[in-house]
């Protein structure tokens, strides 16, 4: 394994049902709960929400990196993410992700798609999930294959 550039550490007790999660530096300190849609009381966050924020922020940073390399000014980029919890045939669960990337200063649809594809190749979350979960991407409203 390559030398780590950064290591994040967290401690969780109680899981997603009635849990608590905290990063080692205290920057994140959250109650973990079952989503209201699944019978929870909606008084905390859940792993899917945390994954949605993490993936979207990581993807936006990856996009900024590839845009800089390609000498493109992307302006105010926004990434909307959706993380869906799905059942599996084995009575387990899996997730799927949708990332809707808005690049308002990139009017050329082909260029927007090229940037999003390039970001998907370098994003650590994309690399970690590739081949394991379904990830649907859109660039300025245009779905990518």
Task: Indicate where each model-derived feature is located.
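Extended beta-strand/beta-hairpin segments
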Residues: 1-53, 60-145
């Amino acid at each position: 394994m390559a030398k780590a550039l950064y290591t994040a550490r967290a401690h969780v007790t109680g899981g997603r049902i009635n849990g608590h999660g905290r990063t080692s530096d205290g920057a994140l300190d959250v109650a973990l709960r079952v989503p209201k849609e699944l019978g929870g009381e909606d008084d905390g966050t859940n792993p899917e929400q945390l994954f949605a924020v993490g993936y979207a922020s990581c993807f936006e940073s990856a996009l900024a990196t590839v845009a800089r390399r390609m000498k493109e000014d992307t302006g105010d980029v926004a990434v909307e993410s959706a993380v869906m919890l799905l059942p599996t045939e084995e009575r387990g669960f899996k997730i799927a992700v949708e990332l809707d990337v808005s690049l308002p200063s990139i009017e050329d649809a082909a260029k927007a798609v090229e940037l999003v594809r390039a970001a998907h190749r370098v994003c650590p979350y994309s690399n970690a999930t590739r081949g394991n979960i379904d990830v649907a991407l859109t660039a300025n409203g245009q779905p990518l294959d």
